[in-house]
Amino acid sequence: MKVVAAVNGLITSEIAAFYALRFAAQHGFPLTLLHVENSLDSLEDVERSMAVIEEAASDDDVTTERILLAGNPIKTIRKYLSANRVDTLFCSTSRHRTFFQNSLRQQLTYLPLPVDLAVVQVVRLDAAHAVRNVVLPIEEDRLSVKKFSFFASFAKTYGAATEIYSVTLVDSEILAKMDIHLTRSLLSKINDHLSHYVKLARCMGIPLRIKHSVARNKIDQVLHHLSHHDFQLMIIGGSRQSGLSTLLRGNPIERLLHETPINTITFYGRDDG
């Protein structure tokens, strides 16, 4: 198995590849630096970025390889992933986009892939090198083992403290009726369901705390929480959906990515629908 980082020569892509390197180093995987040639990217910049990552990889004893391909980016990437044993594909995204922009990242999240996908949004360039606190927002107790494993991988490789931030959504009427007893009962049930993750973190030597919030809007609450705490990295779970469904129903993750003040990695499991 190996980790693949899509490199396009931009600094955000380089930072995404650095996160891929940290993930690969933690699991003992080699790292492939992949570029599909196109008219928009400078090959000189791509090779310069690859050289930077290769130098960092040598310090971590991670084996690297360069793969330069040509053709339709999506078809070429899917063909490469299908022909190789890849654990996770990392790519970068930008918070500055037009409404109808159909980026490589968006196309990858719409399509079924034979690998896990990690989409990195870079807000602070320096944060990738010094991560002290990592946060994983979830709704109530909805957390898969695969997502927790991805989250824990970054906590372990950085030696960072972690937080699972559980948000319970309620409407205004229910929120007004909630008393201390009801709230404690609700949060205690969530803690019970998440207790096995606390045990896993303890076995892995990862400092983990669980925090709760009861709110009407998950994204508003997460953004408020981020603004009042010192996190350097946020891991969130994404779900694959078509561009049409995103247009018709909206996508809360897009708003979170647009407004988040910290670097964020959105994790799409290969089996997540």
Spell out what each predicted region is.
Residues 38-39, 55-89, 94-99, 202-234, ...:
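Structural beta-alpha unit
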